Amino acid sequence: MSGSGGVANSSSTAAANNTAATFQHIFEQLVQQGGGNHKLPPKQLEQLRHLLGNVRDAKNLQMIVEKFKNLEQFHEHYAAHLANNNTVISTEDSNDLVKDNARKYGSGGQTLTPRHTIDAILGLKNRNGAANGSGRNPETVSDGSVDPSLGDDDATDLRCGMTLTQLRSMDNHMASMLQQHAKNGGALPYGPPTPPGGQQPQVPNATPLHHGQQMGGQAGHATHAGHGHPTHHGHAPFGYHNAFGFGQGGHGYGHPEEAAGNYLNSMHQMVEANQLQTGANGANPPPAPLPPSSFGSHQQHLAALAAQAQEQQNQHSKYAKSSPTGAGPPPPPGAYFMESQTAPVAPSQINYDERSMSSASDLEEDDDDAAKLQLDVTSPPTPSPRGQLAAKRKSAGVFCDDNEPKLANGQLPGGNYGIRPRSMEEVHHQQQSHHHQQQQQQQQQQQQLQQQQGFQHDFRNSGNGNPNGNSNSGDHGERLNADSDSLVNGSCASSEDLNQTNSSEQGEKITSGSDDEGQDDNCAKKKHRRNRTTFTTYQLHELERAFEKSHYPDVYSREELAMKVNLPEVRVQVWFQNRRAKWRRQEKSESLRLGLTHFTQLPHRLGCGASGLPVDPWLSPPLLSALPGFLSHPQTVYPSYLTPPLSLAPGNLTMSSLAAMGHHHAHNGPPPPHVGHGGHGQPQPPPPPPPHGVPHPHGSHHVVPLSHLSPHLSRMSPHATSLGSPHHGVTPLGTPLHSSLPPSSTATTVAVSSSQSSSSSASLECSGPDVCMSPQNLSIGNADSNGDGRDLSSDLDAGSTSSNPGSSLDKCAASANIELLDVGRDSPPPPPTPTGKGSSTPPTDMRSNSIATLRIKAKEHLDNLNKGMVSIV
């Protein structure tokens, strides 16, 4: 089939025709083998023949392959049941088969729920009743599950996946294993086989019906005999696995969650039936039914079953207190077990089941064993509602829940110790008591843990109204058991589960030290874990510029910035929070380092990039790779973290660079050329400056790498002195100021004129022992974010180039009122500290450093506000 499928996918018309002919030949052969045209519905034949005519379509080919699979499986069923003339393939069955197979193998990818998986493994949905010979009429085509939509929506329909012969052999093997285990030693390992419906599996009917009628293919429709659905013919496998099943009282098999227990119930019943056959010398054996072939129709089958049940019921009427006799046909197979039919059989057949038919002393032991095992595989996942049958059973005194102590004490009338129905309440009560014991043990463990751990985790549980983390109600027992499982599986506990603080979770919380995060935060992390935001170079550049202006921008500034950089305002706010934390961290560490080393070695925060540029730590390698294009653009504004480093003589002190400032080193010009100095202060001639007004495309090439500098020199970018207006007398570009400087000073001021007359910038690079390198004259006149130069007094120019150290200090102090120390820099500049020979100020400790810095910031900010130089956005 696969080979012909491959041919059908070819584009050749001849190959497609040959394939179509092959498919048609196989199809006709299958139809003839399957019993001729009258066995298949006409619409199905027409549809298949039409598809076979269009094999070249790949979609049609897939459908044809699926249909042929179904037809071949139909053929297997025909071979097994060809003698049965009542076998009819309905259109709905065929369509459902194609649809379900397409669901299983197609691209839909329907999720399989655990119930589907269990049903598929156990074959409970193998509901091709017609192929198994249920004798249905074509018009009675609904599912055996009473709810037709239940079967249609099932994605794991295995109706054609396993023949009845395979099912029968599997069941026989399972039954023999269970029977052998019961003979060898005792209790079944699956927990009590007594179903939670409150009744034992019915035994006298089980023997002949299970092995005679059902195995013969007449498919246990007795399930529906007592349901008031005599015309609702269930599919064979449902009857097969549900002959004594869950349909209690006036409702049919309407609870899909009960399907999980059906298969194992039938297994237990087969074991019990086999044991009954070996020891069937007891009183009142049931009459043997007719062979299945003798029943002409399904109705006769049901009538025979009803008559047989009625006869048994009449024989043992004194035990029939709970069986409804007047509501139509009696329901022997409608529930797990009718007391009236099994009561007399029990005393003579103690080997019926060591668990449910044992003596009084064994009952307590078995129940305890069942509670320990907690493997009650016969109970459905949820208790099913009970109908009239359960109500009447509950009203009967001997068969009620209070039957257990009477049985255990041997007080049952007639000395019959074998029958002890277990109702749903009893099973539930048993489970609850067991869970309660487990819960108490866990509570004791938790109390011990809490005594050790103190009050650290009480507040988490108090939010849920349970301050101690313990819960004494019975229904929390299951949650306590499931709590550790949910933690192991990684699933998030529900809000109710948060009342119980698991011991392992407490340990995790203590070791992690995150006492401020409760279990709700743990849930939120797993549910709402947000991806980390990756900032581009442009976004970081703009954010750093805004951070220079203000560490605490208001909401309007943040919103404007967020629109500018195309980020959510919340992300901008979080970035500022993180940036402030980083700034404080760096300020603290630098102050500590500077205080300890007496400024002999300055912080090396700014590393050198590949091209010799000192860059900030946030410029990671992927960001650095984008920098050349960013730098070569003529209109690019160069922040201070891209400016060349300042090399100083050993005796000089440098101020820590305030990166990402809003000032600009010439709007259209490159960074000013670096005047390199040796490690011992020898002056070197400056390199030729770039032509006036023409931006150098590779301005970064003027930067001298710092590898040749002395280790005590700092790798920092200097603060450019922005000279606001042309009346300062800035020397023309390219004119060195050596002539105006005394020989003792090697300070060089290179003025780079901007093409915009409103702003000119110059980099003041001072080197030599005579010049004061206080923070004031390093950060003089930093332009604000608008690029406007700040007005400086002309005497500051003279002071900065004066050879008199005293006057230089005075001018530096005078300029303190004007210059704005950058607020947004990673770390503040240190205050004036002792230099080689120009000052006698003692070194200050870290705290005074920080306080002095804050005072300077506040003072100069106020001064600039008064002068109107700082534009508040």
From Swiss-Prot:
What is the annotated localization of this protein? Nucleus
- Which BP terms in the Gene Ontology apply to this protein? positive regulation of transcription by RNA polymerase II; regulation of transcription by RNA polymerase II
Keyword annotations for this protein, in alphabetical order, are:
Developmental protein, DNA-binding, Homeobox, Nucleus, Transcription, Transcription regulation
Q: Which regions are flagged for Basic residues bias? A: 224-235
Q: Please name one Pfam family that this protein belongs to.
A: Homeodomain
InterPro entries in the cross-refs: HD (IPR001356), Homeobox_CS (IPR017970), Homeodomain-like_sf (IPR009057), OAR_dom (IPR003654), RAX/RAX2 (IPR043562)
**Start-end of Low complexity biased regions:** 127-137, 293-316, 438-474, 702-714, 731-763, 835-844
Q: Where is this region: Disordered?
A: 127-157, 183-240, 278-339, 374-528, 662-810, 822-850
Q: Name one GO cellular component term.
A: nucleus
Recorded hits in PROSITE patterns, A to Z, give: HOMEOBOX_1 (PS00027), HOMEOBOX_2 (PS50071), OAR (PS50803)
Chain intervals with Polar residues compositional bias: 483-513, 774-785
**Residues in the DNA-binding region annotation:** 528-587
Give the compositionally biased regions (Pro residues): 683-694
SUPFAM superfamilies cross-referenced by the UniProt entry: Homeodomain-like (SSF46689)
Which segment of this protein is annotated as the motif Octapeptide motif? 116-123
Regarding protein family, the annotation reads: Belongs to the paired homeobox family. Bicoid subfamily.
- Database matches in PANTHER family: HOMEOBOX PROTEIN, PUTATIVE-RELATED
**Its job:** Appears to function in brain development.
This protein is called Retinal homeobox protein Rx
Q: What organism does the UniProt record list as the source?
A: Drosophila melanogaster
